[in-house]
Amino acid sequence: MKLDSNNHSVFMMHYHLIMCVKYRRNVINDEVSASLRATFEKIAPDYNIVVEEWNHDQDHVHVLFRGQPNSEISKFINAYKSASSRLVKRDFPEIRQYLWKEMFWSKSYCLLTTGGAPVDVIRQYIQTQSEDAPDRRR
């Protein structure tokens, strides 16, 4: 496992993002998905974000991406949803007839952290740190 780093820290921060079209309208095909991904990848570097995986269904997208401790994830998601909504409606005007009040994305989204050891393993590791540890005082 390769860790990312900056001047003062090492880290590996993966996120799974799910965004749905407003009222789950079935408007995402392969071409629309490619456009949505291109917009994501264009904005992402401004927030120290890198896309690792992308997939879609007709009414939502799944994105696996890496961030950094200074990545402002919620600001990025809001900027992305705003820009991609505007661009997809411009580039695919036929979609407008399926949208409610011109809104492409639902206001909500699901963001999950991923990777590393399971939470229960980390919890147990932290709880047992002082057990049977040699005295490190000098």
Explain the meaning of each model-derived region:
Residues M1-R138:
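Basic nucleic-acid-binding interfaces
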